Amino acid sequence: ELPYISENGSAIHGLNLINQNFPNEIVLSRKKEELLKIFNEKTPERLLNKCVQISKLSKKEQEKIFGQKDDRLKDALKRKYTLPFLFNGNNSEKNKLLKSLSNNSLTLQEGGRVLNLCDNINKIKSMNRIIKILKKTEDKIKTIAVGDNYNDLEMLKNSDVPCLVFNDQFKLDKINIDNLIFSNKPSPEGWADVIKMALEKIGYSN
């Protein structure tokens, strides 16, 4: 078992596995119920009507959206701090929604098949919180960030060794990240590839 960040940076788990003096859990986000209340009260009705909460859809529709069934579908829907939904509007309307959310300290993360309503938090903020804690006991820290989606790009830009795993939505010539390690294999093989290359780059070997 290893430490991990959940729900686009909303919470950090298991740092005590590295050092027993570190916290077991750090929550950086408000609960999804509070976010939903603000969302429903502050979002213009014309935009709200174009938002479909995935939790309110039929199981068959949920399976189609997430590409998962049974326990894996339950895991995909089990959220404490984020709310997945579909937006049935055009790009102009999506930009208006983004502006409305930003004005109310909320954010929207694109996660492949769905959009996620989030607090004003992201993976960079949680990564920086982890680094700050680790620096209490470690002087030299190198961050390796691995991503396979658009909501990972800012995290990659802020890491020492950025790694990108194949995603057919990406066009590499449009991604401006220095020293990017890229795998043209999809996950999970692509993840193993880039991590191996990243460890070699920083001079780590078994």
Predicted feature descriptions by range:
Residues 2-8, 71-72, 162-167:
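Short hydrophobic/aromatic-enriched beta-strand-loop microsegments
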Residues 18-23, 66-69, 197-201:
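Short, surface-exposed amphipathic charged segments that create phosphate/polyanion-binding patches used
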Residues 3, 50, 107, 179-181:
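Conserved beta-strand segments of alpha/beta enzyme cores
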Residues 1-55:
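Active-site phosphate-binding/coordination module
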Residues 45-144:
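Conserved acidic, metal-coordinating active-site core of Asp-based
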Residues 114-206:
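Mg2+-dependent phosphoryl-transfer enzymes with acidic/Ser/Thr/Gly-rich catalytic loops
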Residues 43-44, 100, 173-176:
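Short, conserved catalytic or adaptor-binding loops enriched in Gly and charged residues
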